[in-house]
Amino acid sequence: MQVQFHNGIIADEVTRHVEELAALGPRHSTSENERKAISYIEEKLRSTGRLKVHLQKTEPIVNWREIDSRLRVVEPIEQELTCRAILGCSSTPSKGVIAKLVYGGRGFPEDYESLDLAESIVIHDPPHARTLDNRCGEGQPQRDLRRVIQEGSKGLIEYARLPGRFIQAPLLAGREGLSLPAVSITYQDGLFLKELLQEWYAVPSGIPAHEKSPVRLWMMVKTETKMANSYNVIATKEGTTLPEEKILLVAHHDNAFGPGACDNASATAVLLEVAKAVSLLPSPKKTIEFVSVTGEEYGQAGSSDYVKGCGGSISNVKACVVLDLVGSGDKYYYITKSLYEGKVIEDSSWLNSVLEEVTHGLGFSIEPTILEFASDDGPFIKAGVPTSYICRCISKSWPWLHANEDTPDIIDPNALKVVGEICINTLLTLANSEERMGV
């Protein structure tokens, strides 16, 4: 496949988009902040004057807001813990709940076999990073919680997978939310609770420890939830000789917590600048479509709705490049395998080889890796679309994922330019190729 190299990404311009989007605060799908982000993205795409831009209304997604969350050990000692509600979770009764603490391991069926989950608060270990041995269920992106819910647990606790006083919130809710109160705590507090369960040195001297003495917690979570619609923003550069065939660049604009600078204002910003650069170039043979999607943090809801909206014409999408987490991290990666809806999925080896060829041709380095959970590549792969996923910050030691500390100061402007150049040249290579595209 012949590659003709173009540039046109200005690092400061991409970074400015990141700052504008991050300044909105948390952009939960269907929230007012997300609607402001959608308006910003739409305005920037329309301002090119050379792209056809429209909004695609999604099916309902949970509209969620945290009002308050508290967690306290009440037995065998009293200890207040810092926490925050997990995205999409439900509320406890107004006075909270007091329940025994149960350790559910990694949340696998075998971890629950000897446990009495009824009237309990369950604590789980965090998912493993960059492995394929986690488990998740359809509609629940990063944990299969069906048994916990069915057996009458009163609440759920997840803790960060890295040491520090920050809270990393996992993704547990699908597009309809999570019918269970749930909070996330720090790594240290997670270990503290597990030590209490084992009656180690966490119990102060002088307090008698008995083999069957329970650990009891008080949990209070207050949230507001309702179902609402959101929007994907779609901008099209129509092809000349093969306009019905499409090449996609996809990034999600919603986020889980905090400013969401890297996750995922960084990828949205790259998409905007790549779209502007491509709009100024002659039209390619195939159509290039830029798709800014909602609801990735709720189980890829927006990209699933895009695929569903295509119906049978999804076969006209000949290649899809997904961007997520591109603004900070150790290296540039393309994903080879990940988990989606409880199954291992594979990104396109053919498209990954094109990415690799383009990246090396530009003088940059990119490496393959597996990833514990899919991003918006999942729905496209499931639909049979050759798909690649580019990211940076997937190091096991990257601490800012789904955290308040994901701010613009962690963004590497030059990294955004590199990803933008890779995307421009990959899209144009694919859109101007007359070769049969493989999977």
Predicted region positions:
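N-terminal capping segment at the start of a domain
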Residues: 1-32, 56-58, 166-172, 182, ...
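Metal-dependent peptidase/peptidase-like ectodomains
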Residues: 190, 283, 293-395, 435-438
